[in-house]
């Protein structure tokens, strides 16, 4: 993790890298031709910054991607790139949790095979795919609060032959087909049509405009209409039957977005795509993507320093932090949802009201209680329990993260509200360790969606997370960040890099 803090007004800056080593980074020499009193005042405020700084608020995938694209697409610039993070770690909603010595994803968990930016980031940073099998649950049970209305087959024993595993997959496909019929293919076609349009955001620069508002960005790709109707409306028009929507589709949206099929169509389509095969994650945690991008961008990272206010000072913005420091920035990028952070803007900015959907992730080392599910044995409980949209069901999903033996497992429970100990005592027969995390994970989607501006003030105050009202995922954050970086470059005299690390030509090759 990069940790860089200003240590004084010198011509060099000492910085710490991931290994705890220090290096010297050359900065522009300072020429002192000012009155001594002014010089003393300047030296007494070592956290004041030059007015040509570019500042990013938030170190999650949106903020780190913005930093990366800005430095990757431009020639070396004299501006200092600062990234502010109010927590003590980078990654935003990408984080891990440790249970019994094992590490699991606590936030954004999976990456789709056609998430082309994130794929390239991982390759560029030398990050390996996780190989521990988390997220590979294929024993699905759909619970209605009283019984399992549908279940796939239990997985074959470890070490089973290729033929047995293929036969198992075939039988599960037949079970799904028997229950849901042609709606399975229509559901897949709906998700694939969305992905086909989304892939347009990887086109080369000559055929892909820079967008200054989300509406035009979505209309250009043909995705805007999906944000104006509910997922349920879209799927009915696509020919899906009511059983598929109320069971299978609902399970997927409750797991991925903690919401029902009344979410907007684009968010729903992204959710359906997130249930496909081939999903993967970064070994050691997806947060490493953000950390690596910030390091590659040579960003000055201010950990545990949140921004309290952003004021327009004419040719630059004054950012005041919760540590009492001020930073002068010609460009300011807000890369965190403004819905639950208290940043004061002067003059005020106007964005549509938006609620964030909180997902409570509860990690439990212990054993599920089969009687709670109307079963006689733990071995009868599916490894992924999805739930229907019914008022008396207290959780969205339960999944097995690791099975040490028949009496010792680690589970992840998603719910819309905190699960208290009395309820957990009913769901689990034993609990050795319990960890609770409350995430303002994504917007509460509704149709028609209304979008905040990308440019908040008509000048150089940008908001990456405005795109999140269309859909929220690691890749959508990266796509929105690339557009903001290109927008900044198009509006400032920044020279383009001759051979960026992430070129549009390479992106085209990935999609083939």
Predicted regions and their residues:
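Cleavable N-terminal signal peptides of Sec/SRP-targeted secreted and luminal proteins
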Residues: 31-48
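Beta1/beta-strand and adjacent pyrophosphate-binding region of the FAD-binding site
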Residues: 49-62
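Conserved Rossmann-like nucleotide-cofactor binding loop
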Residues: 62, 66, 89, 339
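Glycine-rich FAD pyrophosphate-binding loop
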Residues: 71-99
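Dinucleotide-binding Rossmann-like beta1-alpha1 core, especially the glycine-rich loop
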Residues: 100-200
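Active-site/ligand-binding neighborhood in enzyme catalytic cores
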Residues: 181-316
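Conserved beta-strand-loop-beta-strand element in the redox core of flavoprotein oxidoreductases
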Residues: 311-327
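C-terminal segments that line or cap access tunnels to active or ligand-binding sites in enzymes
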Residues: 329-331, 336-497, 505-510
């Amino acid at each position: 993790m990069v940790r860089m803090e200003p240590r004084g007004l010198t011509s060099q800056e000492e910085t710490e890298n991931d290994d705890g080593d220090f290096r010297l980074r050359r900065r522009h020499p300072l020429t002192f031709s000012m009155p001594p009193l002014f010089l003393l005042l300047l030296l007494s405020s070592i956290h004041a910054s030059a007015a040509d700084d570019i500042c990013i608020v938030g170190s999650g995938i949106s903020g780190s991607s913005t930093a990366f694209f800005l430095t990757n697409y431009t020639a070396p610039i004299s501006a200092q790139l600062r990234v502010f993070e109010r927590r003590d770690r980078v990654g935003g909603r990408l984080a891990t949790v440790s249970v019994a010595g094992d590490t699991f994803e606590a936030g954004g968990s999976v990456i789709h095979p056609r998430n082309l930016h994130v794929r390239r980031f991982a390759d560029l940073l030398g990050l390996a795919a996780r190989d521990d099998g988390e997220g590979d649950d294929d024993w699905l049970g759909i619970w209605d609060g009283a019984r399992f209305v549908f279940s796939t087959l239990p997985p074959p024993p470890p070490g089973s032959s290729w033929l047995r595993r293929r036969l198992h997959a075939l039988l599960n496909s037949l079970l799904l087909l028997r229950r849901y019929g042609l709606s399975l293919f229509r559901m897949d076609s709906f998700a694939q049509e969305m992905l086909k349009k989304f892939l347009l955001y990887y086109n080369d620069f000559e055929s892909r405009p820079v967008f200054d508002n989300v509406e035009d960005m979505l209309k250009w790709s043909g995705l805007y209409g999906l944000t104006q109707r509910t997922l349920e409306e879209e799927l009915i028009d696509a020919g899906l039957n009511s059983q598929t929507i109320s069971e299978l589709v609902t399970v997927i949206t409750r797991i991925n977005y903690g919401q029902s099929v009344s979410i907007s169509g684009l968010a729903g389509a992204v959710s359906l795509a997130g249930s496909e095969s081939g999903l993967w994650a970064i070994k050691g945690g997806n947060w490493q993507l953000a950390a690596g991008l910030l390091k590659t961008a040579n960003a000055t990272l201010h950990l545990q320093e949140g921004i309290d206010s952003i004021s327009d000072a004419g040719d630059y913005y004054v950012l005041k932090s919760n540590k009492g420091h001020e930073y002068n920035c010609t460009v300011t990028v807000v890369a965190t949802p403004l819905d639950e952070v208290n940043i004061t803007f002067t003059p005020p900015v106007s964005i549509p009201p938006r609620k964030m959907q909180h997902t409570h992730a509860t990690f439990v080392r212990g054993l599920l209680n089969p009687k709670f599910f109307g079963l006689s044995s733990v071995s009868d409980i599916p490894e992924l329990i999805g739930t229907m949209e019914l008022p008396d069901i207290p959780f969205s999903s339960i999944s097995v993260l690791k099975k040490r033996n028949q009496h010792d497992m680690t589970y992840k429970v998603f719910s819309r509200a905190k699960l208290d100990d009395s309820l957990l005592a009913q769901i689990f027969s034993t609990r050795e360790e319990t960890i609770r995390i409350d995430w303002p994970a994504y917007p509460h989607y509704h149709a028609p969606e209304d979008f905040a501006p990308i440019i908040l003030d008509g000048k150089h105050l940008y908001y990456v997370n405005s795109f999140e009202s269309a859909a929220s995922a690691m890749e959508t954050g990266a796509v929105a960040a690339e557009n903001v970086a290109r927008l900044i470059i198009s509006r400032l005299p920044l020279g383009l890099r001759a051979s960026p690390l992430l070129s549009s030509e390479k992106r085209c090759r990935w999609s083939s």
